[in-house]
A protein has these predicted regions:
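N-terminal nicking endonuclease/strand-transfer module with a His-rich metal-binding environment
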Residues: 1-204
Length: 204
């Protein structure tokens, strides 16, 4: 299990990317959420209303206008060998545990599973302004994230790849070797999140 963390100011860009509306068409599924209104389809599956979710995230962010970048995006992936046992339930359990230990259990978040690459992974949009209007502590978040990933990987029996160095936080080598399509998805997401903040091509 490994996590890439990015920060931004556009909930719209992040949510639309995760829900498959930006970049190359993707197969995705909403598998979990917290603190936001959710619609359901006739089969009882999550059927999020995108604009309602965006409005909800933005409304909570306004509780603390000092936080200029309230969008936290977590791209969470696992070793390909875990795919056979990584059901939506197991993935959601691991993600919720990760968010709790990172301090994001008292805020809004949306968990979306993407099925367009060879490594099982999901994306999480979370509000850096919690339910009480406080900014969630992000001090040394990447170091803490790596430690938490290692703990959850061990506790839940996920697969480790070959290790390189302690500096790389013992993240599986196989999971670092992103496929071409995975890299395209990440670029599309980052561009989508940056567009609302850019005033010119140079800024972008």
């Amino acid at each position: 299990m490994m996590v890439k963390i990015t920060t931004g100011s556009s909930f719209g860009g992040a949510i639309k990317y995760d829900e498959g509306l930006l970049g190359k068409e993707q197969v995705y599924e909403t598998i979990g959420f917290e603190g936001i209104d959710m619609d359901y389809d006739s089969m009882g599956r999550f059927a999020p209303n995108l604009q309602d979710m965006i409005d909800s995230f933005e409304l909570q962010a306004e509780l603390n206008p000092k936080v200029s970048q309230p969008v936290k995006h977590f791209a969470i992936s696992w070793h390909p060998d875990d795919a056979v046992n990584l059901t939506n339930k197991v993935m959601t359990e691991a993600v919720r545990q990760y968010l709790k230990e990172m301090g994001y259990d008292n805020t809004q978040y949306l968990i979306t599973r993407h099925l367009g690459t060879d490594n099982p992974h999901c994306h999480v949009v979370a509000n850096a302004v919690d339910n009480d209007g406080k900014k969630i502590n992000d001090y040394m978040e990447r170091k803490r994230s790596a430690d938490i990933c290692k703990k959850i990987t061990n506790d839940m029996g996920f697969t480790w790849g070959s290790h390189k160095s302690a500096r790389q936080s013992e993240i599986p080598t196989d999971c670092r070797q992103r496929t071409y399509e995975s890299a395209r998805y990440e670029i599309a997401r980052d561009v989508a999140c940056a567009i609302p903040e850019a005033k010119s091509i140079k800024d972008l």
